[in-house]
């Protein structure tokens, strides 16, 4: 997958495009705690339920009604409501049921929804969007390193086209779940699947998604526009049109928001320092390249990444997780955090045409494959010998969240 086309894309202008302007496009983004509103997953479920109900209402010739004049119910009819008591169903009547979250909610009281209902909806995403931890066994012609190279290249494409971090992680989720539905995928098809997943993700997340020919261009002729459009349909059908997971970076956004939130009224506006968010997001970027990341839920990955930059007490407060939930993932993530530390903190990048308060949300690309190569050279740190509130030795630890730093953490 050559990257020269990716680098050249920044300098390409087509003659039929409108003249560039220096104005900043408003791309104000809200925190993901409002994701339960107009949830696409609920819409897909509702459409499926209606389709099933409609098919059940059709005339069944095997029911014993042989008269051709039998009246067939139509979807437009509205039947009068029937009381339970009048038909003998009083024993099935029950009071309203209130759902209790499986993890304590860190959300503040919300004026527009129940905080428990919102939190339970967020937790439900982790259980709904499952990934196959043994996905590579289904593809004997592929190696885990090929997945890492592909995802690293997709990050590079995202940076060139100024796509959001959420777009990359949606594409990564689509790719992993699609691969779990297939068998014996050839390595020559891998790039087409990856760029098609990113194409779908961009249309789901971006206000101004790139056109299909722009995605085809960065493949350096390996994938045509028709190839991408055809693969798009195949992927969405295999995923059963379930395209709205709560990604690791979305969970990180929620955790960071809860850690730095001062005013409840500002819950939908980012309150945390951008530089801190970028540092932790880079750790997530590096971890997601490793196929073992499939063993952990997205909420757990984000919480473990935050742990390496803060404290156990803070992570418990903002995630509702306990140390017994975090321990395995935190231990696995230690070499990745040490690799990030050795590489040093990356400066917050600026992008022309992107609002200042949205810069941290743009996916960036750094030498992740080089950093990944160093991960395996580190030995796991013995957390128990560290400190009582276990933070692995040698891992970046910023000031306590109570200080609310506004500058870059060194």
From Swiss-Prot:
Q: Which cysteines are joined by disulfide bonds?
A: none
Entry keyword set = Cell cycle, Cell division, Cyclin, Nucleus, Phosphoprotein
Q: Which gene encodes it?
A: ccne1
* Subunit structure as annotated in this protein's UniProt entry: Interacts with CDK2 protein kinase to form a serine/threonine kinase holoenzyme complex. The cyclin subunit imparts substrate specificity to the complex.
Question: PANTHER family recorded for this chain?
Answer: CYCLINS
Keyword Nuclease annotated: no
Q: What is its main location?
A: nucleus
Q: Which residue windows are transmembrane per the record? A: none
Q: Which SUPFAM superfamilies match?
A: Cyclin-like (SSF47954)
* Record flagged with keyword Metal-binding: no
Q: What family classification does the UniProt entry report for this protein?
A: Belongs to the cyclin family. Cyclin E subfamily.
| InterPro entries for the chain | Cyclin (IPR039361), Cyclin-like_dom (IPR013763), Cyclin-like_sf (IPR036915), Cyclin_C-dom (IPR004367), Cyclin_N (IPR006671), Cyclins_cyclin-box (IPR048258)
Question: Which GO molecular function annotations are given, in alphabetical order?
Answer: cyclin-dependent protein serine/threonine kinase regulator activity; kinase activity
UniProt PTM: Phosphorylation by CDK2 triggers its release from CDK2 and degradation via the ubiquitin proteasome pathway.
Q: Which cell locations does it reside in?
A: Nucleus
Q: Which residues carry this modification: Phosphothreonine?
A: 397
Could you give one GO CC term from the UniProt record? nucleus
Q: Pfam family of this protein, just one?
A: Cyclin_C
Protein's name in the database: G1/S-specific cyclin-E1
Q: Name one GO biological process term.
A: positive regulation of G1/S transition of mitotic cell cycle
Q: Where is this region: Disordered?
A: 1-31, 387-410
- Describe the function of this protein: Essential for the control of the cell cycle at the G1/S (start) transition.
């Amino acid at each position: 997958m050559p990257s020269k086309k990716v680098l050249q894309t920044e300098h390409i202008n087509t003659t039929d495009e409108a003249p560039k302007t220096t104005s900043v496009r408003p791309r104000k983004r809200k925190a993901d705690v409002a994701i339960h509103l107009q949830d696409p997953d609920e819409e897909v479920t509702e459409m499926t339920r209606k389709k099933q109900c409609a098919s059940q209402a059709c005339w069944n010739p095997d029911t014993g009604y042989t008269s051709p004049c039998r009246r067939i119910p139509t979807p437009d009819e509205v039947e009068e409501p029937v009381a339970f008591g009048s038909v003998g169903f009083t024993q099935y009547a029950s009071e309203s049921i209130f759902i209790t979250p499986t993890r304590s909610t860190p959300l503040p009281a919300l004026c527009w929804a129940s905080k428990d209902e919102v939190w339970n909806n967020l937790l439900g995403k982790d259980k709904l969007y499952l990934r196959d931890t043994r996905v590579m066994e289904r593809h004997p012609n592929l190696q885990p390193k090929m997945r890492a190279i592909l995802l690293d290249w997709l990050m590079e494409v995202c940076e060139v086209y100024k796509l959001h971090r959420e777009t990359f992680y949606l594409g990564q989720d689509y790719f992993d779940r699609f691969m779990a539905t297939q068998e014996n995928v050839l390595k020559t098809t891998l790039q087409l699947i990856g760029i098609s997943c990113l194409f779908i993700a961009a249309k789901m997340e971006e206000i101004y998604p790139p056109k299909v020919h722009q995605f085809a261009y960065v493949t350096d002729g390996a994938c045509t526009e028709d190839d991408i459009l055809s693969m798009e349909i195949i992927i969405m059908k295999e995923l059963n049109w379930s395209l709205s997971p709560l990604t690791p970076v979305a969970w990180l956004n929620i955790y960071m928001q809860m850690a730095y939130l001062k005013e409840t009224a500002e819950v939908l506006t980012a309150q945390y320092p951008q530089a801190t968010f970028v540092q932790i997001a880079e750790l997530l970027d590096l971890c997601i390249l490793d196929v073992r990341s499939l063993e952990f839920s997205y909420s757990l990955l984000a919480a473990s990444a935050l742990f390496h930059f803060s404290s156990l007490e803070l992570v418990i407060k903002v995630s509702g997780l306990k140390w017994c939930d975090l321990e395995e993932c935190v231990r696995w993530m230690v070499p990745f955090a040490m690799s990030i530390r050795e590489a040093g903190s990356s400066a917050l990048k600026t992008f022309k045409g992107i609002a200042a308060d949205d810069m941290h949300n743009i996916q960036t690309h750094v030498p992740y494959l080089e950093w990944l190569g160093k991960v395996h050279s580190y030995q796991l740190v013995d957390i128990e010998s560290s400190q009582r509130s276990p933070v692995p030795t040698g891992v970046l630890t910023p000031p306590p969240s109570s200080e609310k730093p506004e500058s870059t953490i060194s």
